[in-house]
UniProtKB/Swiss-Prot annotation:
Keywords: Isoprene biosynthesis, Manganese, Metal-binding, NADP, Oxidoreductase. Belongs to the DXR family. This is 1-deoxy-D-xylulose 5-phosphate reductoisomerase. The lineage of its organism: Bacteria, Bacillati, Bacillota, Clostridia, Eubacteriales. The gene is dxr. PANTHER family: 1-DEOXY-D-XYLULOSE 5-PHOSPHATE REDUCTOISOMERASE, 1-DEOXY-D-XYLULOSE 5-PHOSPHATE REDUCTOISOMERASE, CHLOROPLASTIC. Coiled coil: none annotated.
Amino acid sequence: MKNITILGATGSIGTQTLDVIRREKEELKLVAISANKSDKKVIEIIKEFKPKYAVLMEENAFKIVEDFCIDNKIDTKVLKGMEGMIYISTLEEVNTVVTSVVGMIGLVPTIKAIESGKDIALANKETLVVAGELVISKAKEHNVNILPVDSEHGAIFQCLRGNKKEEVKNIIVTASGGPFRGKKKEELIDVKPEHALKHPKWNMGRKISIDSATLMNKGLEVIEAHFLFGVDYENIKVVVHPQSIVHSMVEYKDGSVIAQMATPDMKLPIQYALNYPNRKESQIEPLDFYKISNLTFEKPDMDTFLPLKLAYEAGKKGGVMPAILNGANEVAVDLFLKGKIEFLQIGDLLQECMNKFYKSMEATLENVISVDKEVREYLGKKYDI
């Protein structure tokens, strides 16, 4: 029996993780959850799974859930804030922590979980982007597995199993291309949030949907891949594959290319990470090759989708530059969703902050938190938020 903590249990990945646990109750047990402010969803999870702990970040939501548990004599202990997240990430009885919260908020709980010897099922891209070197070194120090919970890195992880790192020539990360694949800059001038949120293949949260539309999501995945698999940026390629059947590939020195293919469904990489190193009976629709008419691959347009280009630049620069990129992007996406900036301004703001805030500093926990704060305060004052 594996005991699981889910950070971000009410979001897209968290909800699908609950689906996996629901179907594997004999082998997976939900011990603790966290959420931001979705008190109604948390109450439903408590009623069904009866976790020992539930954490709410928002004060009012915390009180609602706490009162519900007291009034209904439910044993779930309700905690709040970052302190609560760290507590449930370091519980002695927990084997695996699923980090599916969005943004920098997942960084400290993830590091604390690693230091407590927990395997990490990582769906929070920002953790590796801003502090990849620190996270990977901590994982090695504490003999912890970092198991990627996204289709691309989960695919690469599988393609690398049983092979030697020195035999790898290139990692090929596939991208659907998002809702604006094939568009040029002039066609994206009047894009509204509702257009950018309509992803052609995946059902995702609002922030990651915008990242997919700008291709920033793929840029973050490139930086993640660098840290997860120890491959230079020159050997990490992005290929647009609109059918989303090939989830990523590894090219070896002898010319062989190993690809992982499956129906596009996030439950597969979640299930693989939770059950690693074993494979379980599929919870998704099997791939039917007779129904696949064609598979196509294209080069990404980095001029139109500037954030992907900037992610490569930030990754190669190293140090705190990925943290600057990430902090600026989180604020820029929020500004776009609130109608305060245009779609194409997202890339412009990333470029502006990378130029303004870069310092030759090691990516320690203190440094990345400090520079992230500087970027957010600057953009907050600029746009009065």
